[in-house]
Regions:
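Glycine-rich FAD pyrophosphate-binding loop
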Residues: 27-46
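C-terminal lid/capping helical subdomain adjacent to the catalytic/cofactor pocket in oxidative enzymes
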Residues: 171, 232, 367, 371-419
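N-terminal Rossmann-like FAD-binding beta1-loop-alpha1 element of flavoenzymes
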Residues: 7-33
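Core beta-strand elements of the Rossmann-like FAD/NAD(P) dinucleotide-binding domain
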Residues: 5-7, 242-251
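Active-site substrate-recognition segment that forms the wall
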Residues: 50-51, 56, 60-100, 228-231, ...
Length: 419
């Protein structure tokens, strides 16, 4: 199906996925409007670790999850937390999540994710060129470090998935590790380095570059909350009703991240979507502070330290608590002494506490494609931990759908009605 050339497209959501899609569609001649109650790039897109990794093929749920979850839930330093008051509402999603970790399913999911991630860097380069922002992407790679060979051996399953997907990675010894990152504690002796990865030291700056390019070319932005849709005589949505106005639309793209579930429901699609709430702390830069050259995952405590433009950022944790619960920074603050051990010289001065809502499906795959209910509705949400990384390739796939082009990436695995 091909939509009319130069049609009026309304995109709900001005995070990194919505912004990428807006600029991509606009570059192909479409009249694009963005609607979001929050400023562009200020929600989940704001606080990630800044990594764009070609080779993110390991789903969140893996075959050993059943054995690990009980210990994780009762370990105060664990990366996983569930708010027990939210469990009744979470249970259907959680059961699907655990089921997706079965060996055969996890292997299939990994293969399907690889069809997206293998193209993500190329797509980001094209998108950044549209915005004149290629300089924001730094080709420094993605590093995971471990204290010993036994800890590294524990990644065998992940590496097996990477091998079957043809992911480019290197096993590095202590000398190679500390050549890459001399500031990391010396008791880290082995690593896994993925060279095909870029780093964005200020994710918000990338969002703003895309938004600036979009508005300079005539794109329209309404900072308004979507309440409902108006439907035409043919049953298709023809306008978006917000808190301030009614905005006509020929074509709708739902790219509202964690807030997409209710919008999809109003448009006739029931989707299994919840939030993996993620936290970060930013630490002040000091003249004597540690040197870190790229985002680095520290095995064991399972957190990421990234050298952001405004200081070192600690990203950690998955909290399953929905959209309404207040943030709880207890766990991530408890990790600060560990982070200082991993990166000696790290300042203890916290300059920002942040929590964001990762829009997550139980099978770790985004929702990308045309609605089975309405031909003029497209979906682009549910990217979980990979919103930044998959934003540009998602935008290209949406543009291919609008243009009626063969993307060469099968979209059935990402359909909204797969659950």
């Amino acid at each position: 199906m091909r939509d009319s050339p130069g049609c009026k497209v309304t995109i709900i959501g001005a995070g990194i996925v919505g912004l990428a899609t807006a600029l991509t569609l606009q570059s192909e001649g479409h009249d694009v409007t963005l609607i979001d109650p929050r400023p562009p790039g200020s929600a989940t897109s704001f606080g990630n670790a800044g990594a764009i990794v070609s080779g993110g093929v390991v789903p969140t749920a893996t075959p050993d999850l059943w054995q690990r979850v009980p210990k994780m839930l009762f370990d105060p330093m664990s990366p996983l937390k569930i708010r027990w008051s939210y469990l009744p509402k979470l249970t259907p999603w959680l059961l699907r999540f655990l089921d997706s970790g079965r060996r055969a399913k996890a292997l299939k999911i990994s293969r399907e994710l690889s069809t997206l991630t293998e193209h993500c860097l190329e797509a980001h380069h094209r998108l950044a060129d549209l915005a004149g922002a290629r300089h924001i992407l730094k080709p420094v790679g993605w590093l995971k470090v471990y204290r010993d060979d036994d800890a590294y051996a524990g990644t065998a399953y992940d590496r097996g998935l990477m091998d079957q997907a043809g992911v480019n990675y290197q096993h590095i010894n202590a000398e190679e590790l500390h050549q890459l990152e001399p500031g990391i504690a010396r008791d880290y002796t082995v690593g896994l380095f993925q060279p095909d990865a870029s780093f964005v030291s200020t994710p918000y700056a990338l969002s703003q570059a895309l938004f600036s390019a979009f508005t300079k070319r005539g794109g329209i932005h309404h900072q308004e909350e979507v309440r409902r849709f108006e439907f035409g005589d043919n049953g298709e949505p023809r306008a978006v009703v917000t808190t301030h106005a009614i905005h006509p639309a020929d074509l709708l793209v739902v790219a509202a991240g964690a807030w997409s579930k209710d919008l999809a429901r109003q448009l006739g699609s029931k989707v299994s979507l919840d939030t993996e709430r993620g936290y970060h702390l930013s630490f002040a830069r000091t003249e004597a502070g540690p040197v870190l050259n790229r985002p680095t995952v520290f095995g064991g405590p399972q957190f990421v330290l990234s050298p952001m433009a405004d200081g070192i950022r600690l990203n950690a944790g998955v909290e399953l608590a929905g959209l309404d619960a207040e943030p709880d920074f207890t766990r991530i603050k408890a990790l600060v002494p560990l982070a200082q051990q991993c990166l000696p010289g790290l300042s203890g001065e916290i300059t920002r506490e942040w929590m964001g809502y990762r829009p997550s499906t139980p099978d770790s795959k985004p929702v990308i494609g045309r609605s089975p209910v309405h031909g003029n509705v497209l979906y682009a949400f549910g990217h979980g931990h990979m919103g930044l990384g998959l934003s540009a390739i998602t935008a290209k796939l949406i543009a291919d759908l609008v243009a009626g082009r063969d993307s060469r990436i099968p979209l059935a695995p990402f359909a909204v009605d797969r659950f």
